[in-house]
């Protein structure tokens, strides 16, 4: 699809004349939006044909100087970005080294915790053994005390019976030996 645009505007015509400096143009220029090309139709004089103007299409045109400035600024930005990336890579390397050191420390701590866990388990076994032996000893002491308690009860019973006998003997003696 080509679009024909006439030079209705006087300002546009004078702009074209400034570009070419000399010459006249009457006719149309055609813009092809597919490839942003411009075609002319109409009559040109010889001088105008030699100094073909650049007609702006829907895109912007830049000069070589502007392009180089833009390119230089992009190069500078790219250099800054590359420097930042390099610095970040160095920081990442340092952090990786720190992480490696911390991993070694964590491994040592894990070994220490495992060793302490084993010591604790051994201590628990020893304490259980000690408690069991103490419990057995206490059971034996309890049995001994119960046996002694039974003996004391029997001795007490004997003493009570002896006390009763003594009382009866005293009463007999009192009866035999009346008041002197």
Swiss-Prot record:
Residue runs in coiled coils: none
InterPro entries xrefs: DUF16 (IPR002862)
Pfam families: DUF16
Family: Belongs to the UPF0134 family.
Protein name: UPF0134 protein MPN_368
